[in-house]
């Protein structure tokens, strides 16, 4: 089939050529050339044709066609040229040779022989035999295939050859001339072939006619049969001539018989005569008749015809009738190939020689010796058999037989008959024979025999000996004298038995048994170059190193110094199995170790079962200092092996191994600190750091000593040892001249001191040191650490992976990212941990984040290989973190093994998934189990027995809470009202896919991911929802899978790789586009800035920045072409399901424009919150499992059963936090001052970095005040998170979490079924205090706002813990959670603004109540206080409207009616409307207790006094005071408290009045009449306040003073 296909391809090419011929030539000529082309190219390999351009094929065809047009068969034609397109019509990179000759044998072979003789590479040679017809002028008339015509046309051979290009014209002429000369020889030899055979027959006839008496009859008959045998195609005749014996002055001589020459002897007779003379030395010389009838000789000149071999002379004597020699016949030619394969016993003359030798030997042909001798003769060099005489043959053959398979060297030399050649037979043991030995033997023989090498052939059989025949030409006129025994001894020495020496050395080194086993593998393994360079004893040592190699140890080393070496030079041998080691792999390692490679010699050791390489390097230190071999050998070899194995990095730090006398692990430690310096943006390169350490070796060693003193568990540093070491370093630093060097070395010392723990001294179970390093650091001790500064940090470093884990506190949590930012992954993680810190405000742990990079990702790795390496690096990273983390066993802290700790107990380490590690939780938990970590599979949430965030849709649902709240504020119910959306992502994604299924009212008009753009200008909400659901349910999907039939008119799915996209009218309308075509990136930008209701980010990347930010500052190059500015956003709402979709400044800019947007860490906090719930739940139930009350299977089922409730708990946190943000936004518009002060105070305390968080300056905030602007939601998102984090931290440090009443907050994080079964266990939870603190902080900030605690701290002087306790008391005393839930239940039933107004009413009441409890100091416990006040407050709340008086009652009624009209239930409206008055109930209850009255009675008097003195009105005026600073705010709060206090004092006074009416109103009237003077003064003051003539704080200070006087007037009365 292949042949058919190739032939079809050839025909196709010729068809194309034919078409080209027809298009350019006339019809007849085109047909002729086409016929020729088919004949000429018939045998050309297809690949040679296919490589040709059609133009060149056409040109070459015509060129050769023209070449054969004129040809005289008597004159061979040769053309040599370099084809040039302009000159010849075709092009080739080679020199082209065309040969045209009358067809005959040997043409192609002889041309090739000549070209090879000239050293020319033949790239192509094609031969076509053509049947041609020519006219009398030798012009071509027709051409045909010889097989296709019976006409008697001449046969011509056309040869086309391509050889290496030769540009010199003279050289081209020389090639042409030499080929013509060869062709003449061929022509002459072939034309005389039959005449030469006739001469052979004539010789036979002549021999048969005469038989000289002196010739043995058998020899005579043998000569005749030999000539007959020659004529049986066993000899190729090349030349013939005859000689006759003449008498010349009494001496005989040979003279050529004129005109007897045939074949090549007819050509250039003088040259050939000289050639014959030099070959045979006969013509014209003194002739001495030979005893034999026939003789043989070799020509000393290579044949130029047929084969490049030395042709043979066969000389036959001629006799007269008297038996005298009268002349010679001489034939020149070559035995055909069959002769060399034929048994000599079948060849006349040779068979008699063989029989004669057997007779001389006297061995029986059937005996062992006879058979052996016959075999020797059978394989004896055939040419020698013809030329050697019987006696010499017998002597040589018997000498060979005498070797008898012994491993020895023997030499046999034969001189040819005419004294021109030596034929040397050398026998050597086969196992030592090699080309290299053959060359050395040849050189020795040439030197000893004064000869020139001619040829060789090798004979190998099953014998233990190899036979090499050397044909050597005499340099002189005659052979030199030689002693064959001495010469043989030299050959023996040359082929010296180095292997025997190896055996002896092996026996000495390993013992005889082991040595024999070793020799069975390595006897023939070492190459000649190795044997020349090294002794056998050295080889034994090298074999020891080779023996160290195996799968686990692919490299062995030997570091040594030659005896002859001096100074800094050393030698290194590398031993490697399999392939040689590329120099490019080794040289960088040498250089980084501080060594220069002076020379290298590789040796391949070919054992019987494997191949090994020895690389011997000559080295010197780069500083040329003398190296102490004994000191450096061990550390150097181990370091090299570790670097080779990839367990140590190959960089400039390795120079410290020799330069500072360190081992590889000490260098790894210093390198790891340098890597950390790079990550914290220390401004020195790694090479500079390495060079500096190397320049100060003493300081470097002291730094290593300091590290050892601090962390080596085997060290027991005495008192002051560490300080002494530090002192030595500082003393040495004083002598460092370079400021940069000094700074670097001091930073190293600082880093070592800032290190708290390390796994440097930990070993694996196999006893090996771990091949990665982990340092736990206190970053606050590191100068210039980039902000924000984490509380703790673990840096991991190895040749394979680097990573960092940053924590905001001891209990901290966050994901681990597979980063691709090798240069600054810590910067990336630091940015993420900053976001995580604020995101984690709602959960127990502080923010944490980790990231790692894979440093040795396989080049060109596919997805599977990439993932495999990523997992391996992740596993190393996890192990490193656990290596330096405490454990809890039986409730007791257990430090990690072989770790010296310079910090307190620290057992809490929890991780989570992040970019690139979404599926790695089970892997982390397996390692957690492997380490026996107390958290088990709570170590990494979301694993096989954890909560699957995608299945729960928890992140999307959490973000959707933000979306719903934003839209509720805009009067849109996302679950009932349709709204338009532009999305970032695709339905296969967690956040995007789940998010776009959270409402069937979504009209997704456009979306994009990294591959496609989806556009549906006027979608059907229900149908598109169902289609999105279908895509989401697919195992894998993309926008391409969307059913395009469901896409509305003008829409479509477009690849982002498209050059441009046509914009339809519908697209123009929905996205506000004017252009007819846009690039994909331009269309995406148009989608992002379009006027849609929602932009939903569920993808990866940053798409919105501030107009004041550059793309480079954003750090997301992939999306630079898409990114818009925040001010360009025209959507109403942004939902940030994904991270980093907008920069913080981009959010602020969008929010300032009116876009409703929080931040990513607010919107997508559901994921971390869910994970925190999982961890806390697992910690609880794992304790139950550990004591046997729950099986593992039951535990996992319980986790699954609680999924929905966990989701509800998480979403409730999202709901309330976004509610808190909206409330904070409203409050900031009412007065931004408290927020400004809050930021400033946090900043002053070092708890926030305003610049890092992009918070506005004081000046900007004051400017907003002037424009009645508040804080934006993105800014408040940051502040609310800090408010919670700071409060949480203070609460953990206080006794608040231990308060039995407040401790009940622990139950809030657990599903109800856990509370039902394991309530007691909740109060024993290991993180109980942290949970309580977190829940209290969340509750307080969610309902009381960002600045609540700060304001109370300022106004009361209380700390955060006391404020939180007072808040809980006030909250529960008023049973506010019930009211909050009722208000929250009104979502989509009343406007959000109404809900928020109610929340703010309760917030103000609760703030004052909290302050009241802070000041009263009841002396009761939290529980007792709540139990005392709660029921009394409940009583006072009943029918409170009836108790109010005057304007206060009117205000209550109006507010109640307003709320009821808005849709608020009457009961709730009544309670909330009274919020401003309810606060007073606390004082009323306290007064009732003091006066021993019932609270209801006290309340009646209280409200009556207030109404009569218009105290609610005066409090309103105080509240309306504008405050410009904190002092005025404190004063305002003081005025209100004082008025409340005085109202209670007046109430008590009225109640304590002796006598008087019972009715409240009458009793108050009576009391006022008794104090008429003071009363009138107060009334006058009210008039002044009401007139507004005198305002501000001084007036109210006077008013409060007057009220105090009125209250105190009772005593005077």
From Swiss-Prot:
Documented EC number(s): 1.4.1.2
One of the GO biological process terms: glutamate catabolic process
Database matches in SUPFAM superfamilies: Aminoacid dehydrogenase-like, N-terminal domain (SSF53223), NAD(P)-binding Rossmann-fold domains (SSF51735)
Entry's Gene Ontology molecular function annotations: glutamate dehydrogenase (NAD+) activity; L-aspartate:2-oxoglutarate aminotransferase activity
Catalysed reaction equations from the record: L-glutamate + NAD(+) + H2O = 2-oxoglutarate + NH4(+) + NADH + H(+)
Catalytic residues (UniProt): 849
A Pfam cross-reference name: GDH_HM3
Superkingdom of origin: Bacteria
Keywords from the named record: NAD, Oxidoreductase
UniProt xrefs under PANTHER family: NAD-SPECIFIC GLUTAMATE DEHYDROGENASE
Job description of the protein: Involved in arginine catabolism by converting L-glutamate, into 2-oxoglutarate, which is then channeled into the tricarboxylic acid cycle.
Assigned protein family: Belongs to the Glu/Leu/Phe/Val dehydrogenases family.
Name of the protein this chain belongs to: NAD-specific glutamate dehydrogenase
Name of the encoding gene: gdh
